[in-house]
Amino acid sequence: MNMETSHAKLFSLLFILLNSAWSIASSSISESFVQCLSSHIQNSNSSNGIILTRTSSAYPSVLDSSIQNLRFSNNSTPKPEAIITPFDESHVQAAVICSKKNGLQIRTRSGGHDYEGLSYVSISPFIIIDLFNLRSIDVDIENESAWVKSGATLGEVYYSIAQKSKVYGFPAGTCPTIGVGGHISGGGIGTIFRKYGLASDNVIDARIVDVNGRILDRNSMGEELFWAIRGGGGSSFGVILAWKLRLVPVPPAVTVCHITKTKEQGATKLLLKWQNIADKLPEELFIRPVIGSGDKTITVPCFLARLRNFSI
């Protein structure tokens, strides 16, 4: 019994020592990173508003602000050494350079709609670059394009386009709070993709910070990297700062309807029939079945015109 007690105490002591050593090493890395970043942000009015460490009062609220999967907001989830909230592209460059220098992983977050936690969790020491301050949108109707920074949401993009024109749009998703940085770099499916393709198909330029802290556009990054960031996950190759989008023509009025069916009302047969004729439907027609845990299946068709123009 004494031997077992001694072993238990020994293991407890070893655990405490290892945990203390890890905490000291983590603190040292964090301090070194903050010092490096502060030295690179000399032209900023206040680096304190850009760099949030674990001792910062705003750290918890900013960290949790766009975690969409609450399983990653518990105490056992690894937390970043620091959160960087850049106001300028140069701040992103500095964060990349200093994280590389200190051996820290980078997690880039724009809207946080990442249910696997890939934009805010890592098992290795890491920082989060949260782009919510980089959200400007410049719509150019004359040239049918728009420069959109990665921290903007889809809702903000749609609203900005609509403020300039009622007959232009952009083919992306339906959730207004999704950040364009991650949405487009992952492909981006929306209600008009049958006619115009994915969101990533309608990107004509981009700005990215690479691993060496350089800002590259389409010309300087090359076509292979430009191809990869449009669907291959932008954060796999750098930090996406902004996208240049191709705007597409849309009618001033569209037709949207909801069809609700239970299994007993023939929902399964309806879905089967849709699958059999889907490839024959006009490309202006988008149909999305929503199958929930309740009794009803909801089918949501959207037609890019008035209903009188619809024919098969």
Where are these regions (language model features)?
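N-terminal accessory segments
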Residues: N2-Y196, N202, I215-L216, F237-V239, ...
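A glycine-rich, basic-preceded beta-loop-alpha segment at the flavin cofactor/substrate interface
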Residues: V209, R214-V250
